[in-house]
UniProtKB/Swiss-Prot annotation:
Gene Ontology cellular component terms for the protein in this record: extracellular region
Name of the top EC class for this enzyme: hydrolase
UniProt entry tagged with the keyword Signal: yes
Organism: Naja atra (Chinese cobra)
Catalytic activity line of the entry: a 1,2-diacyl-sn-glycero-3-phosphocholine + H2O = a 1-acyl-sn-glycero-3-phosphocholine + a fatty acid + H(+)
Function: Snake venom phospholipase A2 (PLA2) that has high affinity for muscarinic acetylcholine receptors mAChRs (CHRM) and has the ability to activate them. In guinea-pig ileum, produces an onset and dose-dependent contraction. Also has weak anticoagulant activity. PLA2 catalyzes the calcium-dependent hydrolysis of the 2-acyl groups in 3-sn-phosphoglycerides.
Family assignment from sequence similarity: Belongs to the phospholipase A2 family. Group I subfamily. D49 sub-subfamily.
Cofactor note: Binds 1 Ca(2+) ion per subunit.
Compartmental location: Secreted
GO biological process: arachidonate secretion; fatty acid biosynthetic process; lipid catabolic process; phospholipid metabolic process; positive regulation of fibroblast proliferation
Protein name, as recorded: Acidic phospholipase A2 1
Length: 146
């Protein structure tokens, strides 16, 4: 691990421990989790963390179904957001609203935050519209995702 990675890891881990009375800003993945819970309240967000070839860490091969395709599109969306100068999608927070299952990215987000918010919003909406197949949870990636 490079010194830069260690510095980022330390900042992420230590910042919530500060003496400030204000709550720390959550990381983007926490916001994405909340978006998923907004559009798919019947499922735990963890159900999407290790699904198919693309939901979770990394991604390769052919998506196993429509839900996995949602994650592939989300990964590609993050890759596009990374092209914005200084944009790190996994750490970028944004302003959004959930109202009765409807997600809205609020105005006032900078270019990176707006892009990441839209990636997460579209993925959460896609998850809500795709069938969930329990057989595609925690699959053997080496065997099925070539």
């Amino acid at each position: 691990m490079t010194p830069a990675h260690l510095l980022i890891l330390a900042a992420v881990c230590v910042s919530p421990l500060g003496a400030s009375s204000n709550r720390p800003m959550p990381l983007n993945l926490y916001q994405f989790k909340n978006m998923i819970q907004c559009t798919v309240p019947s499922r735990s967000w963890w159900d999407f963390a290790d699904y198919g070839c693309y939901c979770g860490r990394g991604g390769s091969g052919t998506p196993v179904d429509d839900l996995d395709r949602c994650c592939q599109v989300h990964d590609n969306c993050y890759n596009e957001a990374e092209k914005i100068s200084g944009c790190w999608p996994y750490f970028k927070t944004y302003s959004y609203e959930c109202s009765q299952g409807t997600l809205t990215c609020k105005g006032g987000n900078n270019a990176c935050a707006a892009a990441v918010c839209d990636c997460d919003r579209l993925a959460a909406i896609c998850f809500a519209g795709a069938p969930y197949n329990n057989n595609n949870y925690n699959i053997d990636l080496k065997a099925r995702c070539q």
